[in-house]
């Protein structure tokens, strides 16, 4: 029997494409991703937030250092640049980020992941893809 839910706009009911069991497989995957994310920061729950996910993901996607003012905007759920700077400063203090002078503009600073953090994230994303493929296979079998 197909379950019903509201459409994305919240109006009309729609049939679900996947079963409760398949949805549960997805939730197991997201829990696994969260636990793995926490291991990147050696269990430090201060870094278990969407703010750091946004920041680290964007910095990982940029192979070259980015202006600190640009990095402030990576944390989409934080509206205050001052507050975003506090998060960045905490990551610098923990040794996850490198801040250096911008050789092209003395008024700005550049941010990048430390080599160790980049390697941790490389491994994290690699293991997620493996787990995602395994989860997809389990979902297909249902």
Language-model features: locations:
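N-terminal leader segment of winged-helix/HTH proteins
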Residues: 1-46
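Short amphipathic alpha-helical elements of helix-turn-helix/winged-helix folds
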Residues: 54, 58-62
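Short acidic, hydrophobic short linear motifs in intrinsically disordered regions
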Residues: 65-75
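Short amphipathic alpha-helical interaction segments
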Residues: 78-93
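Short, cationic-aromatic polyanion-contact patches
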Residues: 102-124
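Amphipathic alpha-helical dimerization/coiled-coil segments
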Residues: 122-142
């Amino acid at each position: 029997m197909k379950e019903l839910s509201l459409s994305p706009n919240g109006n009309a009911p729609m049939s679900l494409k996947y079963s409760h069991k398949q949805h549960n497989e997805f939730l197991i995957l997201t829990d696994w991703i969260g636990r793995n994310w926490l291991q990147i920061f050696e269990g430090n729950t201060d870094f278990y937030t969407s703010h750091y996910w946004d920041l680290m993901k964007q910095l990982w996607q940029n192979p070259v250092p980015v202006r600190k003012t640009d990095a402030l905007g990576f944390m989409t759920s934080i509206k205050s640049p001052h507050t975003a700077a506090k998060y960045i400063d905490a990551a610098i203090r923990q040794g996850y980020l490198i801040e250096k002078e911008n050789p092209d503009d003395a008024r700005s600073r550049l941010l990048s992941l430390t080599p160790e953090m980049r390697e941790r994230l490389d491994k994290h994303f690699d293991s997620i893809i493996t787990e995602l493929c395994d989860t997809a296979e389990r979902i297909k079998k249902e």
